[in-house]
Regions:
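A domain-level signal for the structural core that forms small-molecule/cofactor-binding pockets
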Residues: 1-207
Length: 207
């Protein structure tokens, strides 16, 4: 089955992944042939097609082929009604336009309701990692992370996600600007000035 979109998800078995690696390696060798790279006779490149295919399936794009993180949500027994914030979560992804990396950090937050669900902080990291490991644009990554947090934190009063990243497609080609791109997705209470400002203050405190 093909992914409908580059940043989609179709979980594969280990056997299917190995078949994909072999198939992708064969095609990447042809890609290098088209670029007139004599990779078969270069000791530094002779295994490059297999290395690249393995890296994409098992690391760079593993979010396309693995099951999502198992997340257990707990009842908010203490009726905590403040913000839950986790910032500076590493983002290692790559754009679906040029297949070049973009690297940065994600800041996430949600406000549980007194009768809603809460999750462990490590689960926010796992959500970011799961969606980062696939080809996409930063805007979509921001929305995917937001929507997953919104689903698992049932009854929440609001979710906020911000991503700050440097894109290699801008740094090494074209205008070659070492600029930082910021994207955000806010919902619920974070649409209001005070919670939104508190979130931004938490992000600013990390600088």
């Amino acid at each position: 089955m093909k992914l409908k979109y580059a940043n989609g998800n179709t979980p594969l078995t280990e056997e299917q992944k190995q078949e994909m690696i072999l198939d992708a390696a064969e095609h990447y060798g042809k890609y290098m042939d088209a670029l007139k790279i004599d990779w078969r006779n270069d000791p530094n490149s002779s295994d490059t097609p297999h290395r690249v295919a393995k890296a994409f399936v098992n690391d760079l794009a593993e979010g396309c082929y693995n099951q999502g993180p198992k997340i257990t949500a707990f009842d908010n027994l203490d009726e905590y009604d403040g913000m839950v914030f986790q910032g500076n979560i590493k983002v290692n992804s790559f754009c679906s336009h040029h297949h070049l990396p973009f690297i940065g950090v994600a800041h996430t937050a949600y406000i549980p309701s007194k009768d809603g669900k809460i999750i462990g902080l490590s689960k926010l990291n796992r959500i970011v990692e799961f969606y980062s490991r696939r080809p996409q644009v930063q805007e979509n990554l921001t929305m995917q992370i937001h929507d997953h947090i919104n689903r698992v934190c049932e009854g929440n009063l609001g979710v906020a996600v911000m991503i700050e990243a440097n894109h290699m497609c801008a740094c090494v080609r074209g205008v070659k600007h070492d600029a930082t791109m910021k994207t955000s997705k806010l919902s619920g209470a974070f649409k209001k000035a005070a919670p939104r400002q508190e979130f931004y203050n938490f992000v600013g405190d990390l600088k």
